[in-house]
Amino acid sequence: MTAANQNYGTGRRKSSSARVFIKPGSGNITINQRSLEVYFGRETSRMVVRQPLELVELLDKLDLYITVKGGGISGQAGAIRHGITRALMEYDETLRPALRAAGFVTRDARRVERKKVGLHKARRRPQYSKR
C-alpha cells in the first residue's frame, strides 16, 4: 500500500490495538486480510466498526485497510472504531466536532480491574456466614 493519498490512525481499547489506513474508494473494509463480515461474526461488532463512517456519511466513499491484534472481539471492535475516528480526523479536520459530540474521539480508558488476595474476583467477596 502506497503512502500517497491515504490517512492513518491508531486506535486502542482494553488490550487491543488497531492500525487503520483509509483512502478514497468504494467502501471496502479489510481487517487482517479478511472482510468485515467474515472477521466479525456478530452484527453488534460490525455496527460498532461502521459507526464513525455512518456518522460522517463516508461509508461508501472510503476504503479501509485495518490490522488489529490483542484482546477479544469487543475490544478489537472498539479499537478499530477509535482508529477509524483518528484517521478520519487526519483526512478532514472539520469532521472532529461531529465525531467528538458522538463520543468517538475519546479513548475509553477502562481496563480490567485486578483480582485481589482474599477475594474471589476483583470485588466479589467470599460468602459471609453469620454462624
Curated annotation (Swiss-Prot):
- Gene3D superfamilies membership: 3.30.230.10
One Gene Ontology BP term is: translation
Among the GO molecular function terms of this UniProt record, one is: RNA binding
One Pfam family, please name it: Ribosomal_S9
Which controlled-vocabulary keywords does the entry list?
A: Ribonucleoprotein, Ribosomal protein
Q: Which domain of life is it from?
A: Bacteria
GO terms for cellular component: cytosolic small ribosomal subunit
InterPro entries linked: Ribosomal_Su5_D2-typ_SF, Ribosomal_uS9, Ribosomal_uS9_bac/plastid, Ribosomal_uS9_CS, Ribsml_uS5_D2-typ_fold_subgr
- Family to which this protein belongs: Belongs to the universal ribosomal protein uS9 family.
Name used for this protein in its record: Small ribosomal subunit protein uS9
Q: Which organism is it from?
A: Haemophilus ducreyi (strain 35000HP / ATCC 700724)
